A protein has these predicted regions:
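Mobile genetic element proteins and their domesticated derivatives, centered on retroelements
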Residues: 1, 32, 36, 45, ...
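Surface-exposed loop/turn segments and immediately adjacent short secondary-structure elements
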Residues: 1-102, 108, 115-116
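Inter-domain linker/hinge segments that demarcate the starts of reverse transcriptase
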Residues: 29-36, 64-71, 120-125, 149-162, ...
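Conserved catalytic palm subdomain of right-hand nucleotidyl-transferase polymerases, strongest
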Residues: 42-49, 87, 99-109, 150-190
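Hydrophobic (often cysteine-bearing) scaffold residues that line and stabilize catalytic clefts
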Residues: 46, 50, 57, 61, ...
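Active-site palm subdomain of RNA-directed nucleic acid polymerases
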Residues: 121-139, 164, 241-277
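Catalytic palm subdomain of template-directed nucleic-acid polymerases
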Residues: 178-196, 270-292
Length: 292
């Protein structure tokens, strides 16, 4: 939840207004078939049953997945066996020094069944989050009809508006390094409950989804030992991006309180026409509170 900040501005707790999301509704054969049909056929090294077989033998597997999903949603419990990721480091581009870990991008592989369950949840969770007044209207990531183009248009519009008013434009790009890896679970879950009205078994499902996750690294034929993750929204997941957007939603309130224009795409924020001496300390203070 939002906290009090030092300096000239005070940020208060945002509360949810509307109908709570207390349970994920049961899914049908048709729901699962639609999800499977839209999923890419790229195999996962963690799959006991490859995605191509799930698709080609849907008449056999759909009923099993429906039963698994509905039992999971009813109990508010994300299956533990689908919470392990295999991470493969990929060199960001050819020619980079392969001995430096910073030159690699971690590619996280999750099981196909995990992604099926996540997509079934996303169908219900996304409209609930986006329909809340607490979800930033200036976030172009993860929203239907929005993209990097809408983010760029918003930034350009702020520049042109300033030019029309004969004002100088200053644009600041704020990027969070390894942001998905440092999300504090207690803050995220509290924000979902208090600010977005996710409660009861729906919140329990999301709690078990993001907590007690594991991963290991594989390079060639060698695999590391498995490590337990304590602060993360899953890389390579379906739900990770929208959960991260909810986690960082208060950024908009902080920026708007200074009377400036801003726009976001995923974990990138762009600020224009701002009062730097007061805005940046508040922004950095909030970031420190969320990621330490």
């Amino acid at each position: 939840m939002l906290q009090s900040f030092t300096g000239s501005h005070l940020f208060v707790l945002r509360t949810f207004v509307g109908n709570e999301l207390s349970v994920f509704s049961p899914v049908t054969d048709g729901d699962v078939r639609r999800v499977l049909s839209k999923m890419p056929s790229k195999p996962s090294p963690l799959d006991a049953v490859p995605i191509t077989l799930l698709k080609s033998c849907a008449d056999v597997f759909v009923a099993i997945i429906v039963r698994l999903a509905n039992l999971s949603f009813t109990e508010g419990h994300s299956p533990a066996r689908y919470k392990k990721a295999q991470v493969m480091p990929l060199l960001k581009k050819s020619g980079l020094d392969s001995s430096l870990p910073s030159n690699y991008r971690p590619i996280s592989n999750l099981s196909t069944i995990s992604k099926v369950l996540e997509r079934l949840v996303l169908v219900q969770l996304r409209p609930h989050l986006l329909g809340s007044v607490n979800f930033s209207e200036y976030q172009s990531g993860y929203r239907t009809g929005h993209s990097t183009e809408t983010a760029l248009l918003e930034v350009l519009d702020s520049v042109y508006t300033a030019a029309d008013d004969k004002q100088l434009s200053v644009i600041i790009g704020l990027d969070l390094s390894a942001a998905f890896d440092t999300v504090q679970h207690d803050i995220l879950l509290n924000r979902l409950r208090v600010e977005f009205g996710v409660t009861s078994t729906a919140l329990s499902w999301l709690t078990t989804y993001i907590t007690n996750r594991e991963q290991y690294v594989k390079v060639g034929q060698q695999s590391s030992s498995t490590v337990h993750l304590t602060s993360v929204v899953p890389q390579g997941s379906v739900l990770g991006p929208i959960l991260f957007a909810a986690y960082t939603s208060p950024v908009g309130d902080i920026i708007k309180s200074h009377g400036v224009r801003y726009h976001q795409y995923a974990d990138d924020s762009y600020i224009s026409r701002c009062e730097l001496p007061t805005l940046l300390p508040d922004y950095l203070f909030w970031q420190t509170a969320q990621w330490t």
